[in-house]
Amino acid sequence: MNLLIIITINITLSFILISIAFWLPQMNLYSEKANPYECGFDPTSSARLPFSMKFFLVAITFLLFDLEIALLLPLPWAIQTTNTTTMMATAFILVTILALGLSYEWTQKGLEWTE
């Protein structure tokens, strides 16, 4: 019963905060706030730099493999448990899924900088 109350309160608070964050910024729209500021002068060029999608894909792939390492680091301690078969199967499934994802990314040429 306590868990149900806590979940209800969390969902309600989350909904209220998301609603406030969605509606509050739209109350005051000033065009000056959207412009970049360069010591009172008009900007000479665009303040927004282009973003490389290739870099983004490589960065996301790095984060996935970094997370894999973080998940596999406790394996030496998990080997000491009584149920090593389940632990090894879970680790094998995790590594297999990530290897399949990497091979798919490689075949789709998502890891190459030049086209």
From Swiss-Prot:
Its main location: mitochondrion. It catalyses: a ubiquinone + NADH + 5 H(+)(in) = a ubiquinol + NAD(+) + 4 H(+)(out). Coiled coil: none annotated. It is an enzyme of class 7 (translocase). GO terms for biological process: cellular response to glucocorticoid stimulus; mitochondrial electron transport, NADH to ubiquinone; response to hormone; response to light intensity; response to oxidative stress. GO terms for cellular component: mitochondrial inner membrane; respiratory chain complex I. One of its GO terms (molecular function) is NADH dehydrogenase (ubiquinone) activity. The chain crosses the membrane at residues 3-23, 55-75, 86-106. It comes from the Eukaryota. It is found in: Mitochondrion inner membrane. Its EC number is 7.1.1.2. It is a multi-pass membrane protein. Gene3D superfamilies: NADH:ubiquinone/plastoquinone oxidoreductase, chain 3. Keywords: Electron transport, Membrane, Mitochondrion, Mitochondrion inner membrane, NAD, Respiratory chain, Translocase, Transmembrane, Transmembrane helix, Transport, Ubiquinone. It holds the Pfam family Oxidored_q4. Core subunit of the mitochondrial membrane respiratory chain NADH dehydrogenase (Complex I) which catalyzes electron transfer from NADH through the respiratory chain, using ubiquinone as an electron acceptor. Essential for the catalytic activity of complex I. Core subunit of respiratory chain NADH dehydrogenase (Complex I) which is composed of 45 different subunits. Interacts with TMEM186. Interacts with TMEM242. Belongs to the complex I subunit 3 family. This is NADH-ubiquinone oxidoreductase chain 3. The gene is Mt-nd3.
